[in-house]
């Protein structure tokens, strides 16, 4: 019985060793930054919001384009329900929003009356799933 068990374990280890090159290794820093909303700013990651334990958080930006105009908007809500929204017609930020992924870290600031004044997107390996 012991011999059969040893043979089975040996075969299993050999099999795992042979196929281990095909198994991806996930390493490195991983941050699931939750959403924070201040009086005139918001920051966080979409993944952090999505995988948070509450059902309140969201963050993201969108782009509206047609033949005559384009503008961006960003919105966020933290775990307490505090929300933030801003918009901009600044054409430089269209490129920034287009570079955004579901793993991007987003930091956005706005004036009190709504226009975005700063938009930072950080695409970094620590923000990947």
What is the predicted function of each stretch?
Residues 2-10:
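Bacterial N-terminal signal peptides that target proteins for export
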Residues 28-68:
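Short, surface-exposed binding/anchoring microloops in extracellular/periplasmic proteins
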């Amino acid at each position: 019985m012991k011999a059969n068990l040893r043979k089975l374990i040996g075969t299993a280890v050999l099999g795992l060793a042979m196929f281990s090159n095909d198994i991806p290794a996930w390493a490195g820093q991983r941050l699931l930054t939750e959403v924070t909303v201040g009086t005139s700013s918001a920051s966080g990651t979409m993944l952090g919001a999505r995988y948070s334990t509450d059902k309140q958080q969201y963050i993201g930006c969108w782009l509206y384009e047609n033949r005559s105009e384009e503008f961006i908007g960003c919105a966020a809500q933290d775990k307490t329900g505090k929300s933030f929204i801003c918009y901009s017609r600044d054409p430089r930020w269209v490129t920034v929003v287009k570079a955004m992924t579901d793993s991007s870290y987003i930091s956005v600031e706005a004036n009190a009356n709504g226009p975005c004044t700063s938009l930072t997107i950080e695409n970094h390996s620590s923000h990947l799933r």
